[in-house]
Amino acid sequence: MIKQALISVSDKTGIVDFAKALSGLGVKLLSTGGTAKLLADAGLPVTEVADYTGFPEMLDGRVKTLHPKVHGGILARRDLPEHMQALEAHGIPTIDLLVVNLYPFVQTIAKDDCTLADAIENIDIGGPTMLRSAAKNHRDVTVVVDPADYAVVLDEMKANGNTVGYKTNFRLATKVFAHTAQYDGAITNYLTSLGDDLQHGSRNAYPATLNLAFDKVQDLRYGENPHQSAAFYRDVATPAGALANYRQLQGKELSYNNIADSDAAWECVKTFDAPACVIIKHANPCGVAVGADAGEAYAKAFQTDPTSAFGGIIAFNREVDEVAAQAVAKQFVEVLIAPSFSEAAKQVFAAKQNVRLLEIALGEGHNAFDLKRVGGGLLVQSLDSKNVQPRELRVVTKRHPTPKEMDDLLFAWRVAKYVKSNAIVFCGNGMTLGVGAGQMSRVDSARIASIKAQNAGLTLAGSAVASDAFFPFRDGLDVVVAAGATCVIQPGGSVRDDEVIAAADEHNIAMVMTGVRHFRH
């Protein structure tokens, strides 16, 4: 039964209302510093911890709750007579509810003008100590670290005579240990990122010790293949607009492959300003287009490779209206992603309940790092977020691209970044015409891309081609020109660049170099 609570919070969201409700249930309130003042100003009967322990706060507040009367009241097991006798002998009442959240360390180090001294002062000591004590003794103590749990605790107390059940206490305790682990992980990441000068502004993006924190969203039916188990986890600091923020409107449970392909589709479609549609199969774009609206973008994207689009993942960067929904509904689709769906569009898909509809708000930001597991280790790199600007391009051929060709080249280059290497992409008029992906030789990717276009009945005459990396020989260039391309965009950087440029001049096509490679594995 909860008779006494200790409240000490940095995030004061909802704390006054929570404390009022506790007081109304007859719970005695203990508090510290700014929290105690806030509660007292709200007219609540609150006892300062310093008055409770008989020992004043000291060292600029560094020592205030580190006292036996606090930790004894938290850690004592109520089912052990010797524990309760010890409390009685020393005049220590039990503390049955602990409400604590920690100094804002992560928010502090996110500031550009943060100093090491600022960071150190925002490392909480008393808070984690109390939290861990209460979480360890969760059979007897309810511990709350998240304001979102205030209502849960109050509801149980009101329903059960000021008592919170063991299952709830256990869940709250696990939340505490996850929170303190993440807190300590953030501190370690920061301190081990500092260089010899210990300056905030020159810290290493890759700390000596890297701690990552993810919360489980759901267990999955299986992994990449049916014999593999799997689960989906969300980054505790999920950036706005990330796939992990999806809201599923209808459809079956997402699979491992659904999530992986959906991420590829969403990341690609977000890069376009005009209404765009991306169709993904096995993490590769098989159709990408922009149009006047979602419906036109889809119609153009689907033309690229209708065969591969079967059972694909489709993403839009605009609301899906009824017209677009009716077009998509004619095909077999696994997942459809958009910032929103009109009510009419939802009605169209209501008749196709197996189609998974995901809403994700378009937003800025992306994952801080790209991670790849290897045997016994982890590769960590910055995200490939480079989008080349026209002024950064270098025309290396005698013929310059026309304005239309330049538009097509930039579109093709944007798509190529999301195609598995080796990647060759034919484009024209705001749509992909042929995609060659994942081949061990660039010339084979070029051949496959042209064959794909032929199979779809699309002409490559006057098309633009993007290559995610340089042409090591002229053979790949010869293939795309023979297929009908009149301009090419590629990074350059080969020892045979001169040979490839000479071949382009021989064919009288335009070639531009970006100086940026987009390998994707």
From Swiss-Prot:
GO terms for molecular function: IMP cyclohydrolase activity; phosphoribosylaminoimidazolecarboxamide formyltransferase activity. It comes from the Bacteria. Pathway: Purine metabolism; IMP biosynthesis via de novo pathway; 5-formamido-1-(5-phospho-D-ribosyl)imidazole-4-carboxamide from 5-amino-1-(5-phospho-D-ribosyl)imidazole-4-carboxamide (10-formyl THF route): step 1/1; Purine metabolism; IMP biosynthesis via de novo pathway; IMP from 5-formamido-1-(5-phospho-D-ribosyl)imidazole-4-carboxamide: step 1/1. Pfam families: AICARFT_IMPCHas, MGS. One of its GO terms (biological process) is 'de novo' IMP biosynthetic process. InterPro entries: AICAR_Tfase_dup_dom_sf, Cytidine_deaminase-like, MGS-like_dom, MGS-like_dom_sf, PurH-like. Gene3D superfamilies: 3.40.140.20, Methylglyoxal synthase-like domain. Keywords: Hydrolase, Multifunctional enzyme, Purine biosynthesis, Transferase. GO terms for cellular component: cytosol. Residues 1-145 form the MGS-like domain. It catalyses: (6R)-10-formyltetrahydrofolate + 5-amino-1-(5-phospho-beta-D-ribosyl)imidazole-4-carboxamide = 5-formamido-1-(5-phospho-D-ribosyl)imidazole-4-carboxamide + (6S)-5,6,7,8-tetrahydrofolate; IMP + H2O = 5-formamido-1-(5-phospho-D-ribosyl)imidazole-4-carboxamide. SUPFAM superfamilies: Cytidine deaminase-like (SSF53927), Methylglyoxal synthase-like (SSF52335). Belongs to the PurH family. The IMP cyclohydrolase activity resides in the N-terminal region. This is Bifunctional purine biosynthesis protein PurH. It comes from Burkholderia thailandensis (strain ATCC 700388 / DSM 13276 / CCUG 48851 / CIP 106301 / E264).
